[in-house]
Amino acid sequence: MPATSRRRGARSAVPRVLTGTVYVTRQVHFNAAHRLYNPARSRAWNERQYGLCANPRGHGHNYLLEVTVRGEPDPATGYVLDLGELKRILQRTILDPCDHRNLNEEVRFLRGIIPSTENLVLAFWGRIAPEVPPPAVL
């Protein structure tokens, strides 16, 4: 009998395919400084609106960014998206340009934007979403 023969009743090596939509989240950390200030408004308005966050010298944060992709796992890999690939996308689109930078002054894609949490989410989404390969969706 050849060494590669299968035992009687043994199952094939083809994996079972599970179906359904899943959500997979990756977290990344970065540090950055920013200033909340609307140049179209007065200094007094900015100080009332943003308080210490309007400090002319800015202030810093330790950011935690969570990115979730949605989709059905690929039957061949079991992945919605290889998390290593998502990590590379986040490194290239967010961490490399933003980590240890002044978001108002040093990050080109944030210039002219008030870097509130809400605006950062929108700006980051705009950079990450086009990089996520289908069928995964941000």
What spans do the regions from the language model cover?
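Charge-rich, low-complexity N-terminal segments
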Residues: 2-138
